[in-house]
Amino acid sequence: MQPSSPTRTVALFISDLHLQPEMPETTAAFLHFLQRHAIHAKQLYLLGDIFEYWAGDDDLTSPFAHTIATALRRVSDAGVALFWIAGNRDFLVGDVFAKATQATLLEDPTILQLGENRYILSHGDQLCTDDVAYQHFRTQVRQSAWKTAFLARPLAERKEIIAGMRMQSQQHQKNQLDKHAERIMDVNPAAVTALFSRTASTTLIHGHTHRPGSHLNETTRRYVLSDWDVDHHPARGGWLALQQDGSLLRYNVTGDCIT
């Protein structure tokens, strides 16, 4: 007798891959994930910072961006529904990218309703309310007028500006570490509680903080996704899988279930 085939995974959740040409092993691991795992799920949710940066959809013509978009399109062509929530690195992803990959762009946060279960999906950066400087920056660059003006600049100029922003961000994070204030780069507990209350949900899935873990109590569940880096040792990365029975399983970057 042949063993029964496994139940198809309802959804996979990943974030914070920070894909870039300078990280070829991480890129290869992501492409492997798409070909061997994501293609067998019903839905794939990309919860932000999939790219290290995104200067605009006109960059889709670059070989690297084209490779990633083509790989995602293969997954959607196989019948997997793709969903995208912007991160702080790739919030300029727009309709052209969505059409190329057949991904649906979602608001942050988004509620995923499956049967009686409600799941809050978010990149997670807006929950880091203790980082006041970042929240001010986030508010500014998410405005339609700012994005329109920025995208009107030549692509090369946009990339130069983004490179400068990345350097400033790295220095900002270093300063916070020097001040022993790592807590401001994590989610604010009150902001998380307010989100649970506002959405009448009990499960939250997010990334951004690079602090993977499961925070479970009697009333709520908060799952933090891992960032990815396979180019350095030890390798890290992975995803969360939602099963038909509502359970959530965590997998590491090599595809081993670790929960």
Pin down the residues of each PLM region.
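Short histidine/acidic/glycine/proline-rich micro-motifs that form metal-
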Residues: 17-20, 127
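A short, polar/proline- and glycine-enriched secondary-structure boundary/capping micro-motif
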Residues: 24, 130-133, 258-259
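Active-site-proximal loop/helix segment associated with metal-binding centers of metalloenzymes
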Residues: 124-187
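Beta-strand-turn-beta hairpins that frame and shape the catalytic cleft
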Residues: 3-12, 112-120, 216-221
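Short, solvent-exposed aromatic-acidic interface loops
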Residues: 250-259
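Conserved beta-sheet core of the metallophosphoesterase superfamily
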Residues: 100-107, 120, 125, 131-137, ...
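Core catalytic region of metal-dependent phosphoesterases/phosphodiesterases
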Residues: 5-10, 19-114
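Active-site neighborhood of phospho(di)ester-bond hydrolases with catalytic His/Asp-centered motifs
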Residues: 13-15, 44-48, 81-88, 121-122, ...
